[in-house]
Amino acid sequence: SWDERFAIADAMLLRRYEAGPSVDPEVARAWERIVASRGRVRVDELAVETGWSRTRLWSRFRSQIGLSPKRAARLVRFDHAAHHLAAGLSAAQVAAEGGYADQSHLHRDVRSFTGATPTAVAGAPWLAVDDVAWPGYRTFLQDGRP
């Protein structure tokens, strides 16, 4: 019957989903390093720490995480900046403490990720909610899967 066929297909898809794609330990460590450094780590440093070339790290990271290491670091740095903006820190303070070259660098990153200004992001604290920004983050670190 169709119900049985759908049940078989559903069970097969569920098994595939639960197995999930595996993540290389080096990629997981690179991600952990990016998060621990709040996005303030150079891709060259990550490559040295993993023992891979910059090109191999870039390729494996992108295929397994879905972002390049540089883009992931920018996103993590932005996330911390958004938290600080939502907490009421000025854009100048956030830029200085967040590793941005200057306030206009922060402005460009905020605009790039949100399409809004730092002032608008400060008024939208939902952008800085961890369980929205990083769903499954803890699971990723424990399971080694995104």
Can you name each region flagged by the protein language model?
Residues 80-84, 105-107:
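Histidine (H) residue identity feature
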Residues 114:
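A glycine-rich, hydrophobic loop/mini-helix early in the fold
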